Amino acid sequence: MRTRYEAFVDDVPLSSVDPAVIVADIAETEPDTRRQTAQYPTGDGQRVLRTMRQALRVTVEFEIHTQDVRRRADICERVVRWAQGRVLKVNYRPEQRLRVICETPPSVTSSLSWTQRLRAVFCAYAIPYWEDAQATRVTVNGNGSQDAYVRGTAARALVEASVENRGNTVIKAVTLKAGDTAFAFANISIPAGGSLVTGYDDERVLSARIGGTSVLARRTTESSDDLLAPCGQRVTFAVSGAGANAKTTFTVRGWYL
């Protein structure tokens, strides 16, 4: 039996766990949202101030085509281990990915029904959007700006950056801009050959480091909370204060509704 679907976790296909595994279906649910509202000063009704997307779930259903009870249990355990990765891809979204946790791992509830459908439920909390599998990279040499089209259908997406000091003098301050957001660093020290790197982990925790030292506290009060680029349009990425010998690379993956 061939499957129409395929799911990948950390680029490993589910069907590769065992030849007996058949991917039966993949379902995406409506995202969990919460609306922040304010009461109108007179009369009934509320004004929607903000709609916050909180989570996005994908359910992968599969069958284990073997009547051997022990083998079924062993294969299911291997699928559980497969599901512990952090990046989910599906074959009908070949150019996108989702950062997830396995919220509900599969389990064999019947030893007799060898055609029973099992399911693994994945949930994206930190970034509840599908995002580009291949990032867009924009390079700015020295101080200046560069425009680039950022893919996606969501409002905005996170931007990461790396400032490489290719000169012979220390870079003591730098400002990075993406759209209408900016990170301004002061009283830092990027040595010759060193780099300032800003980025986000799987839990969307921001970091900014020079070598192994955090410089997150060196952002000025004018800095934005996050570096963000609008999706579905051309965006200006800019650098100032880095000097003529700096090379800055901005990295962004467009988000999709």
What are these regions (language model features)?
Residues 15-26, 101-106, 219-221:
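A structural signal for short, hydrophobic beta-strand segments that form beta-sheets
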Residues 38-70, 114-128, 233-235:
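Oligomerization/assembly interface segments of phage tail-like spikes and tubes
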Residues 1-37:
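Polar/acidic, low-complexity leader/linker segments enriched in S/T/G and N/D
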